Structure formats: C-alpha cells, structure tokens
Amino acid sequence: MNYFRYKQFNKDVITVAVGYYLRYALSYRDISEILRGRGVNVHHSTVYRWVQEYAPILYQIWKKKHKKAYYKWRIDETYIKIKGKWSYLYRAIDAEGHTLDIWLRKQRDNHSAYAFIKRLIKQFGKPQKVITDQAPSTKVAMAKVIKAFKLKPDCHCTSKYLNNLIEQDHRHIKVRKTRYQSINTAKNTLKGIECIYALYKKNRRSLQIYGFSPCHEISIMLAS
C-alpha cells in the first residue's frame, strides 16, 4: 500500500518529520525549524497533520506484528491532561519490559481497567502473573478478570516496588509539554509515540541502540 500517494512532499521529508516528533520531545514548530535548516519549508500545522495521519497507521502495523508476550505482565496508568482535564493512559509491559499495549481513557475505574486487561488477553492470551499497583479499581478489575477468564486465584500481585519498571516507562510521556486539545488528538499522538518507543526499547534490549533511527523504522513499517 502506498501511504504517500498524492502528497506534496517527498516521503523522506514526511518520515523525518513524523519520526523526530514521535521519538523526541520536540514541538511541531521545532520540527518545522529543523526542516527549514535542511532547505525544506514545511509549516508546523502540516507537521501536525502528518503526525495525526501516520501515528495511528504505525500503531496498527506495530500491533499486527506484535503478537507474543512473556507470561508476566505489569500494568499501570498515568495522568494525561487534555484540554484542562485529566485523562488516564493505561500501559502494560511484559517481563522483559517490552510494551504490550496502551489505552487512553477518560475515567480511571474498574470498568476501564477490566476492558484494558480483557483487550490484552484477547491479543496475547492468558498471563500467569499480573503485577499492578494497589489502586482499588485495579483490584476489582483483576478479580473480575480472574473469574471471567478462569485464571489462577494467585496470579494477581499488588506491589508499589515490583511495579517500578513500568512506572519508568511513563517518563518519556511526562517530559513532553504537549497540550492536547481533544481526546482524539491525544489518542493518535500517543499511539505513535508509544509505537516508536516500543521499537526503541526492543533495539536497546537487543544491544542495537546505537543503530536506532525512528525515520528508518517508520520507512520499513510503511513499506511493508
């Protein structure tokens, strides 16, 4: 599939713009200035539209290829401000620290947590161990999951310290000062950011960190 058909700019320009934004804590204006320094004049609003268009595509391609997970999962959530109101980004990683999935919700309750875990099981199968924080909503959700999917009663472990690994994964989101104006904008952007970060972590754990290029990864994904 040609994802760059009828585009005014060359695909290399688009992949650089999208890759830089999704990988680094840069603004759309920063990306526009970087491209201008390379002799390419692109308005920052155009960069925004590219990110909104390609980030969900990259996320879907990544999810289709990402089907395996280790038996132990860690699940946590963090706060994301959207148009002045708090929303909640649920995140899951496996025993090796690889990202399983993310999900942005307006509410932090047992229904949201249950739906997220159910979604994970549908994609990766049943886990042997799930580590979460001690939030009451998560405990209720896990009790429902254990009953619904007939998991072992002791598969759920709550610990603030055992879950430190996944809390570190929130940092690359927290360092950004992005002001999201709608839930859809936030969803699209975060899907792209998490997709690239997941690929970065995979390269880092396979000792290929010095060869990681978000633009190269995007080119490969969109060429498949």
From Swiss-Prot:
This is Transposase for insertion sequence element IS257 in transposon Tn4003. GO terms for biological process: DNA integration; DNA recombination; transposition. Keywords: DNA recombination, DNA-binding, Plasmid, Transposable element, Transposition. Residues 73-222 form the Integrase catalytic domain. InterPro entries: DDE_dom, Integrase_cat-core, IS_Transposase, RNaseH-like_sf, RNaseH_sf, Transpos_IS6. GO terms for molecular function: DNA binding. Involved in the transposition of the insertion sequence. Pfam families: DDE_Tnp_IS240. Residues 33-52 bind DNA.
